[in-house]
Amino acid sequence: CADALCLEHYGLSERSYDIARRAAEIARACVERYSAGSRRRFVAGSVGPSTRNISLANDVTEEQLGDVYETVIRGQLDGGVDLILVETVMDSRNASIAVERCRRLNAEIPIAVSAVLSRLEGRVANGAPIATFLKELPMDDIALVGFNCSSSPRAMGASLETLAAECDKP
């Protein structure tokens, strides 16, 4: 994770942009090296989970979290990513802040959002029902929605069925 809040632990918060940009550049170089003919590959810039869940954090504001996300996204865009993946999301507000900051920087790049599922079936990690989570996202700015963590394959399958019924995005 290249966000400054995660990097604080290592004394590297000031390197957030550089780390995000360099990671994207390395991935872009690999894509260029291994793409051949019709087998095109893509680079997704990961805006991973922050160490702060905005609904619970009392030490960071939405503006501060947005600035943290924006720095990472700017680095990834400058490094040549093809899409932004807001991933391992536990809170719709965190995801929305990341999506909004991405759109400020680039109106066209595809954005995917991938949430963590709760152990409670049909809910995301913060306990919100999947349908509520989806309604709270800025869906007009999002190209793809999915999940990347679950307690079991069965729970993932049931959640994907709910996602398919509630969302018209791939």
Regions found by a protein language model. Name each.
Residues 1-170:
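Domain-level signal for soluble alpha/beta catalytic cores
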